[in-house]
Amino acid sequence: MIDRSGEVERRCHIATREVIAVALTFILHLGGCGGSATPPSATEPPTPPPPETEPLVSAFVAFVGVDVLPMDSEILLVDQTVIVKDRRIQTVDLRSNVALPQDAVQVDGTGLVLMPGLADMHVHLLEEDLPAYLAYGITTVRNMWGHAAVSDMDALIRNGALRGPFIYSTSPGIDGPPAKWPVTQLVESPAEATATVARLVGEGWTMLKVYQDLRPDVYQAVVEAARAHDVPFVGHVPHRVGLREVLLSGQASLEHLGGYDVALGGARGTAGWLQMDAGKIPEAVTWTWESGAYVCPTLAVFKEIAATSSAEDASVIAGNRRTFVKALHEGYVPLLVGTDSGIDLVAPGSSLHEELREFVEAGLPPYVTLAAATITPARFLGEEEEFGAVREGLRADLLLLTGNPLTDISVLSDPAGIMVNGDWYSGDALETLSRRSGNF
């Protein structure tokens, strides 16, 4: 979640969905939410989808005569057959080399392109949004504020009882006072920070989120405890710590380009981006590259925030942020595509395609843009043997497209079919999923 510093709080009345009240949304300002990471639960657990949304489930599915964009390299493999068996990619080879299993369900791939499913690397997940992610080809998400309902959804998705993208989640956010969001892990001293990290790791969180109001000594205690427990920490640049110190700390990812506003423009938020000093960009890029951190810019949602400024200022702010993202790419900093969806400023699912367009408009090459939503997230999460590419042995999370996204990225938003964990959505099943998503 972005620190909007008063710029869009007046918009927050739009967050009226019932789920927000019972499943931890991130619009409501609640105080005193420190303590246990277990939030109030919804009255009912996540439920499987109704029968009409069921995808085709088969032990064998064969995509025949399809062109493959594997995404672990910048090539297009033509006239391939891709066989999926038991939810894994079993075969990727020339059609002429492959004998089809007799019981395989065949999908004619002639004139179509198969690529990995997409990853949204910054979401705030609600069960009601699961169909939207799938309908837009998003088969993996990184949830950026953990709570019990997310853990429940993850377990149901992984055992096939609930349809949705695979979830990788951070812990609830660790922050200093005042607590801003539900289940904030409020820490006010190094000792509290050390104990909180130990408790969160004991609860099973494998990635920690830091937030914006940690004091420098408390942030350092979180860093040391995370290292001691061998868990990565990600999130915001705390205001009193600053960009340089966060990069030196080993924070694995930085969200929203936070901290760069101050480093480049001398002020937080839109004011910093409005007065960005381009002469400071090379140093900030070098710091970032040397740190090994990944950056998740969330350009599209920040455009919504900047829209509260004048049209001229909003254009400058968006342009400066795109300029900096291009500089990060040119400086070999790995980028992640993320949206901040789930807070009602951008729509789940469709906003990822807006973010991809922002990357392209920033001047990033199409392959780099696509990689930031496929193979790069897999590398960041250490899951290259699970997802992010069309390769034998990986999870069968796939998009079937009517064209080549390397030449026309818009084809991503209207897939011919979607496979998530081996379940195939096309035709009526895809149409039903699309209707349920609420974004069509």
Model regions and ranges:
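C-terminal motif of bacterial Sec signal peptides marking the signal peptidase cleavage site
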Residues: 30-32
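Histidine-rich, glycine-flanked metal-binding segment
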Residues: 48, 52-59, 68, 73-115
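Acidic, glycine-enriched loop/beta-strand segments at the rims
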Residues: 51-54, 68-81, 94-95, 347, ...
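Divalent-metal coordination cores built from histidine and acidic residues
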Residues: 109-114, 129-238, 251-260, 265-308
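Histidine/acidic-residue-rich catalytic or RNA/ligand-binding cores of hydrolases
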Residues: 154, 243-251, 265-267, 301-322, ...
